[in-house]
A protein has these predicted regions:
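P-loop NTPase nucleotide-binding module
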Residues: 1
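Phosphate-binding/switch region of NTP-binding enzymes
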Residues: 5, 12-13, 73, 90-181
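Conserved inter-motif catalytic segment of the P-loop NTP-binding fold
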Residues: 4-90, 94, 171-175, 181-183
Length: 185
């Protein structure tokens, strides 16, 4: 949340979590920074909506509610939940075009999360392939097979600056912490 925001808003949409986990997720960035609140951080849990309602809600928040305010980062955790079927070419193209339009019109970065196929590192479905082709950076998180409890973060590809692979673990309080004795993949 700190970064180089310069007063811009961070808007986080979660499509999968139930209210208990969504609430914990919404509070985590504030706790990590030692803040009680941040008027520029907005979190929305969309689990109970269908895919069309989710798209319309996101459009409303970005293009109506915060229309005249500077948005720096939009996080959509659950891009697959913006379509009825991740292999539907038409819906996948619509979502890809929506994301590109929003990032262009709002002059902001949009980060989406999409799962990979089982037994593969490829993003799920036609939607995953479409987003992969247009993304600025593709970052993969996976459970570390050597050190249990660690999550390894790898920059699979980037149009600009890549970063070195690193790992983190969750502390007892549920907050992530970089692992100092990380290993090379």
């Amino acid at each position: 949340l700190k970064g180089h925001r310069q007063g811009r808003k961070i808007i986080h949409f979660d499509t999968e979590q139930g209210m208990f986990h969504a609430s914990k997720l919404a509070k985590r960035p504030l706790v990590m920074n030692g803040w009680m609140q941040d008027d520029n951080y907005h979190f929305y849990a969309l689990r109970t909506m269908d895919y069309k309602q989710r798209r319309n809600f996101i459009e409303y928040i970005l293009c109506t509610k915060f229309k005249d305010e500077k948005i720096g980062l939009v996080i959509i955790d659950g891009a697959a939940d913006l379509v009825s079927d991740v292999n539907n070419m038409e819906q996948s193209t619509e979502v890809q075009e929506l994301l590109m339009r929003w990032s262009g019109e709002l002059n902001c970065h949009i980060s989406t999360i999409i799962h990979s196929n089982y037994g593969s590192s490829k993003p799920t479905g036609v939607l995953g392939s479409a987003l992969e082709k247009k993304c600025e950076s593709q970052i993969m998180l996976e459970k570390n097979s050597v050190n249990k409890g660690w999550v390894t973060v790898e920059c699979r590809r980037g149009r600009n600056r890549n970063f070195d692979t690193f790992s983190f673990a969750f502390e007892e309080n549920g907050l992530p912490k970089f692992v100092d004795n990380d290993y090379d993949l």
